[in-house]
Amino acid sequence: MTISTDRPAPVSSWRTYRRLLAFAKPYRLLLVAALIAALIEAAGTTGFLALMKPITDETFIYKNAEVSRWLPVQIILLFVVRGVAGYITDMAMGKSARSIARDLRIKVMAKYLRLPGSRFDSEPVPSMLIRLGSDSDQVAQAAVDAVKVMIQQSLQVIGALALMLWHSWQVTLTILVLAPVLAWVMDKVARRYRRISHSIQESGAQLLQAADQTLSSHQEVKIYGAQQTEMERYGALANRNLRLAMKVESTRGISTATVQMIGAIGLSALLFVAGAQALAGRLTAGDFVVLMTSMLTIIPGLKQLTNVQNMVQRGLASAERLFSVLDSPDEPDQGTVPLTRAKGLIEFRDVTARYPGQVNPALADVSFVAQPGTVTAIVGRSGSGKSSLIKLIPRFYEAEAGQILLDGHPVQAYALADLRRQIALVGQQVMLFDGSIADNVAFGEMRNADAGQLERAILGANAMEFVAQLPEGLQSHVGTKGGRLSGGQRQRLAIARAMLKDAPVLILDEATAALDNESERLVQDALHKLMPDRTTLVIAHRLSTIEHADQVLVMDQGRIVERGTHHQLLAQGGLYSHLHGMQFRERQA
């Protein structure tokens, strides 16, 4: 099944926003408190504007000493109340926004772990990190931070307009004629922001992916002198990101200038009409100051409401990217057959498998039986389908045709968790997590293993000889991806993990291919302790390591072209004999 990671199909902004607001429901009490506080804050702003009339008329025109004494106290009280309300609004909205970002990250991370393996082939990990990182933050900003700005500024604009209507409805209605023009500008700005936001987020993911590839392969980059090439490639992506960012700045600048121009026209209209009203004796100096300061409050409020469109549209674009993950189908998991501990009988019946977007199948009509307690070796040239075959057993991928059976039942008949509980995997590239040795061996469902079980597994894997020399023993940290340990040490910890799991099916994917002779000897010895009484499938690069396998499957171009024991295949003089002869000559050279 092909999984696309292209830009999500556009949906209505309101539909996306409504779905996004569902994540705010657990924090509705906080949001209600923030709304009430925002109303008080807006009332404080409106109250201060209303004081402009007595300040002007009573203090400067009528010289009223009594009013002049209590006005400063009122102003201080207003701003104290307004400041407290603003603090409550910021804290309540901030807590809600950060909580929504956390909830989204956890939900999307959990979803990624339920997606089929093909998703991880079609979407690079840096893109996933962008979704879990900046996308989640921008969604939180759209869901709450933008709402905070819109509520605060809208209430202040409404309060200022109400005050203007109270003092002179004629002047106010003259200014409101400009409202349709302003609404048109804000709509255009919102549409442009949304278009650019999709592109800039995709550009950010490409930048992160390019950096990840270059830095992860820094040794190859240096040894082949590719620094200039990689910097040119990264620079081109960075320049594209810059161009998109400048489009955002250009849109913001033009929209701000347009809103300010509309505000200037409104201010000019106010001066003209208010002057006429004053000449007719219908406006006092205090009324004019109230109208003027209210208008000067409205203009920056409108500017912020226009600029917040960028935050909203980027958040909505991020929300669509996150929802595209959340809406992706999980791994199929409809199995109902109970499975406590399998016997380990594995059978492939005419299995064909194909990767998404590939014309040629990775596997074609593959059939074999692995009896319980036996060792099945799988060999062949690079790209012959060996790894594809073993990935089908734990259902990391699904077969296109044919059946894979465990103990006589199709693997789809079992629940995924039950099926995977029967399998231990030791690969060439061992993944250790940033934690202690004990945490990495007693991993996942084995985390409650007792100290005796853990020690026996480490001893059996020939790992105790280096673990005992570490300052903190089992509690020693292995570093990111096990970076503090050698390849052989990591491999032995992976074997210890498999020993502790004690699964009836063991998969070894070229477990000794990249090791030196001494490390290989220790790992091979540990594997020989691990393999008895299990159904073992071994992908082998070094054919000398599988001479005692119960059966050897030789693969080429996705098909099993030879099968038999080591000695039978050598006697046939086919592909296996050819590969064995090549390795023998290499060792002799």
From Swiss-Prot:
Main localization is: membrane
What class does this enzyme belong to in the EC scheme?
translocase
Top-level lineage group: Bacteria
Q: Where in the cell is it found?
A: Cell inner membrane
Q: Which family does it belong to?
A: Belongs to the ABC transporter superfamily. Lipid exporter (TC 3.A.1.106) family.
Q: What does the subunit section of this Swiss-Prot or TrEMBL entry state?
A: Homodimer.
Give the protein's recorded name: ATP-dependent lipid A-core flippase
Q: What is the lineage of its organism?
A: Bacteria, Pseudomonadati, Pseudomonadota, Gammaproteobacteria, Lysobacterales
